[in-house]
Amino acid sequence: MRLTDFSFELPESLIAHYPQAQRSACRLLSLDGPTGDLTHGTFTDLLDKLNPGDLLVFNNTRVIPARLFGRKASGGKIEVLVERMLDDHRVLAHIRASKAPKPGAELLLGDDESVNATMTARHDALFEVQFNDARPVLDILNSIGHMPLPPYIERPDEEADRELYQTVYSQKPGAVAAPTAGLHFDEPLLERLRAKGIEMAFVTLHVGAGTFQPVRVESIEDHVMHSEYAEVPQEVVDAVLAAKARGNKVVAVGTTSVRSLESAAQAAQDALIAPFFGDTQIFIYPGYQYKVIDALVTNFHLPESTLIMLVSAFAGYKHTMNAYREAVKAEYRFFSYGDAMYITYNPQAINERPGE
């Protein structure tokens, strides 16, 4: 499959730079996987699409203020984007500088350059950084870090983003990008879902900066996925199996929940799904056999991204690309702070490839 198969025209004006004033007030485009039928509505319509006993699976990762500005002690300006916290004093990070720091280089971080750190080693594209500070890394980031807004949101981060670029149920710090489908759930909507008898379970996948890396190969089968840490605990496995046994739907909130659940299914030897704690590089594109998920809540993704490939594998290539063309025509808002889709599984999607 060619990368260009997943391209579509997107006017700049449809990229959302700020979220809706009310989380659950965004628009919702519903795609019926088997037929391709589209329905336009608002996000709270989700209440009517779910039945008592259906299971929503959320990603409870919490975005850390992972972007740091500063300079090398030798002079040059740097920008550090923390990819992963290794322990209380060490991180793996991307570093932007006119000249990459060498091992042993001293870094002065923070707008006032008050935090001292050392670049200790390089691991391919990532740099290992040791903070020379008594405080734990997370405290330092909360103190001097900036929220790592996606590259297509072309504005500096604001204080409000610390709350807005975060799901209301986020718990475990470690992501450098929000699991954005979850941004549309506010407490009143969660309360109404619970009142209807909708079950909820929480996986953790710490979204890495790699989620914004463009696919750089023409043939998508050659793409190597970035690695992210995921946790699917026993209680999630139990909830999934119980929902399936009842004949209810398992609904993933966001592509990160999809990737967590499907990683846990791939790792299960003879069961449908088993607990999973570890790094995943799962790459889902047309031809992939979904094992766990019956429906998906997700935002609108970038052209030629691995995420539009994941959706195509779920709903079918033609239905997906048609839905995106319709969304552009109807002026839905795209990407992280944009509108949402609700998609049901198309069992025929596995047999469909672009160009067929």
From Swiss-Prot:
Family annotation (SUPFAM superfamilies): QueA-like (SSF111337)
Pathway field: tRNA modification; tRNA-queuosine biosynthesis
S-adenosyl-L-methionine as UniProt keyword: yes
Keyword GTP-binding: no
Keywords from the named record: Cytoplasm, Queuosine biosynthesis, S-adenosyl-L-methionine, Transferase
Entry EC number(s): 2.4.99.17
Family statement: Belongs to the QueA family.
This protein's name: S-adenosylmethionine:tRNA ribosyltransferase-isomerase
